């Protein structure tokens, strides 16, 4: 299990400070201008796979209510960035918020090894409750047999037809019915699913140690939590991250697993267009299994102004940089170089061991041709040898910080840095690679890798 929380935070109180209404207490997570649901799914998937070295998923499910593409399968970009086997099925499960927990439930009820990734970008009209309460993020779960950190005990689902939240094709924002309607419908569905899940797992309610409750309707989630009696209800992250919709059930499950003790029974309750309840028992391997806990990501944040948030979300249009926009990325070139572009895979000369970034057919140390081994570099850390701050290059969020990176074990590469200001960067700083969007032209997203400063303590 893993969760991904973007680096930036919006103080909800800033909304009222600018618009005179809206906002609230706490913060919400904000994806950077160079992130979308695909890149956040990649980040969550990378963290999940790092926690399970040697895992080879034979299926990938990607759930989101805000896909980067329609018609085109978004999971294929995630598949390529994670360097999964070409024989692994990659499919989207998107459109509805329930698809996140639905994809997870489907994987749990299936055989084989499945990687389920979910991500969402959530917003609303300026000053709306949706804008303030939403959040951006991703989650991932590697489901299979063998050594597990949490054993699936059973689950249950209840489905009902009612329209509490909707968004039509082409609409920018969701719309909702009056909150009390959902509050009156969801708790009964939740109770039905709760009782059925306990029966499926042959458990009594007092055997459950912790429960996480997710719903887009906060009032319904609150009523459900109270109805569970003495079970400990974990923090729903609403005060620090916000509601990440499709990704949120997985994010809460990851948070709950990260703090669990071996033997504890954990329950995930999701109230979205019905109710889903999943029950797990923390295994002995749960202690220290997380590569980068959600709590650590929540703590390592930087504030973002409300004006910048509105600009990044396209709610206001700023004067663009007085520079030519980058051209459209060639899909043919991208396909030919997909191992480099999506997986950040260089080449290493067999004779000399010299690393080539980008990959080359002829080594710079000799004249040997096509005598190379693949060199995956996405998970290799690097040191900033030098850097520059470019105020002239085109960027939706200038200035750009470019660094020369020296990778551990050899290899040097000039690279853009992200999730930082010019004052944050120093020669000698340690960085890691992150999958981002370089730009979008004619509806084609140009994905590649940037560097970001390693969190303190890593």
Language-model segments: which ranges?
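Claisen-condensing/thiolase-fold acyl-transfer catalytic domains that form or cleave C-C bonds
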Residues: 38, 42, 67-68, 85-87, ...
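Phosphate/pyrophosphate-binding loops at sites that engage ATP/ADP/AMP, CoA/4′-phosphopantetheine
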Residues: 44-58, 191-209, 228-229, 414
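OB-fold/S1-family single-stranded nucleic acid-binding modules
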Residues: 434-458
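Short aromatic-glycine-enriched beta-strand elements
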Residues: 392-404, 445-448
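Short nucleic-acid-contacting surface segments enriched for D/E, G, S/T with interspersed K/R
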Residues: 419-433
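Cys/His-rich short segments
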Residues: 323-381
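Condensing-enzyme catalytic core mediating Claisen C-C bond formation in acyl metabolism
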Residues: 1-37, 128-184, 188, 261, ...
């Amino acid at each position: 299990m893993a969760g991904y929380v973007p680096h930036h935070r919006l103080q909800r109180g800033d909304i009222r400070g600018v618009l005179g209404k809206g906002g609230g207490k706490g913060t919400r997570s904000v994806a950077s201008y160079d992130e979308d649901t695909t890149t956040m799914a990649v980040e969550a998937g990378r963290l999940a796979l790092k926690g399970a070295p040697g895992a080879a998923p034979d299926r990938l499910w990607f759930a989101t209510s805000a896909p980067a593409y329609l018609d085109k399968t978004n999971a294929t970009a995630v598949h390529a960035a994670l360097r999964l086997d070409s024989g692994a099925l990659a499919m989207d499960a998107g459109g509805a918020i329930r698809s996140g927990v639905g994809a997870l439930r489907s994987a749990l009820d299936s055989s084989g090894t499945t990687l389920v990734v979910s991500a969402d970008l959530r917003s609303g009209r300026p000053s709306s409750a949706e804008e303030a309460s939403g959040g951006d993020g991703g989650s991932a779960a590697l489901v299979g047999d063998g050594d597990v950190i949490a054993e699936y005990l059973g689950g249950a689902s209840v489905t009902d037809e009612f329209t509490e939240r909707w968004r039509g094709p082409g609409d920018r924002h969701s719309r909702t019915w009056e909150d009390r309607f959902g509050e009156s419908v969801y708790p009964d569905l939740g109770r039905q699913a709760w009782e059925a899940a306990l029966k499926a797992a042959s458990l009594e309610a007092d055997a459950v140690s912790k429960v996480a409750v997710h719903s887009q309707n906060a009032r319904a989630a609150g009523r459900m939590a109270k109805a569970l009696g003495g079970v400990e209800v974990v923090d729903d992250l609403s005060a620090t991250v916000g509601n990440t919709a499709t990704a949120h059930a997985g994010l809460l499950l990851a948070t709950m697993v990260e703090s669990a003790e071996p033997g504890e029974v954990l329950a995930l309750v999701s109230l979205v267009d019905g109710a889903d309840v999943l029950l797990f028992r923390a295994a002995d391997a749960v202690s220290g299994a997380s590569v980068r806990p959600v709590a650590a990501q929540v703590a390592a944040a930087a504030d973002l102004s409300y004006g910048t948030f509105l600009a990044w979300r396209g709610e206001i249009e700023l004067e663009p940089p007085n520079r030519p926009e980058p051209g459209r990325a060639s899909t043919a070139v991208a396909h030919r170089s997909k191992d480099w572009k999506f997986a950040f895979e260089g080449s290493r000369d067999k004779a000399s061991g010299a690393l080539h970034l980008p990959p080359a057919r002829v080594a710079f140390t000799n004249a040997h041709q096509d005598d190379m081994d693949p060199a995956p570099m996405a998970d290799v850390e690097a040191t900033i040898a030098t850097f520059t701050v470019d105020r002239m290059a085109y960027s939706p969020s200038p200035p750009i910080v470019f660094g020369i990176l020296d990778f551990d074990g050899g290899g040097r590469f000039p690279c853009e840095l992200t999730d930082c200001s010019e004052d944050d960067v120093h020669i000698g700083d340690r960085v890691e690679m992150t999958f981002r969007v370089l730009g979008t032209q004619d509806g084609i997203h140009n994905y590649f890798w940037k560097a970001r400063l390693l969190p303190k303590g890593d």
